[in-house]
Amino acid sequence: ISTGELNEGQKYDFDFDHQFIETGKYDAKPTYKKFTGYSPGVAVIGDHIVGIENRDGNTNVRFRQQDTLERIFTRLEDNGIHIDRVRMDCGSCSEEIVDVVKDHCNHFYIRANRCSAFYDDMFILRGWRTEEINGIEFELNSIIVEKWKGKPYRLVVQRQRRTDKTQELWE
């Protein structure tokens, strides 16, 4: 707000992900990406970093992520910034994280982990819709799931034709 890049009272799209930074610093830890470094959680609105918190390179990306997000969301809200949509990858697909996210936005999109419990249901889905995403053609569909008891969410499923003509499904 102080730089004039974001406007109080306006709604924004919010992206969150962990960035892996290779470094040889003495306190850096090995990452699951097989190099030594840091992996801070980074929150972005448009081209603007609105939150960043470091964590050890070898810490699971879900570790206390809900606390990091709560601090970032609260700081934005205290400054009159409202979040319309949140986008996150599968590293944020946990009940604790979803509970925090849903309280601070109108809509959220979190890529789910592959889940064998839903895999068979994917093959009986009808009405797949073809969409091009970043130049790649996907087929999309959705189902309502209760991954966490008593909390139904819409799961969007995408699949892509492989060159060997079999289909790949993932949630």
Where does each model-flagged region fall?
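Active-site-proximal, Lys/Arg-enriched surface segment
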Residues: 1-42
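Short helix-loop-beta connector
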Residues: 7-8, 80-82
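Short, conserved catalytic/metal-binding motifs centered on acidic residues
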Residues: 12-20, 47, 83-93, 108
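Active-site beta-loop-alpha junctions enriched in small/polar residues
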Residues: 19-21, 55-57, 91-93, 113-115
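A short acidic (Asp/Glu
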Residues: 25, 94-101, 119-123
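Electropositive, glycine- and tryptophan-enriched low-complexity nucleic-acid-binding patches
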Residues: 31-79
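Short, surface-exposed basic-aromatic patches at helix termini and helix-loop junctions that form
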Residues: 78, 98-107
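An anionic, glycine-rich sequence signature occurring as long contiguous blocks
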Residues: 107-171
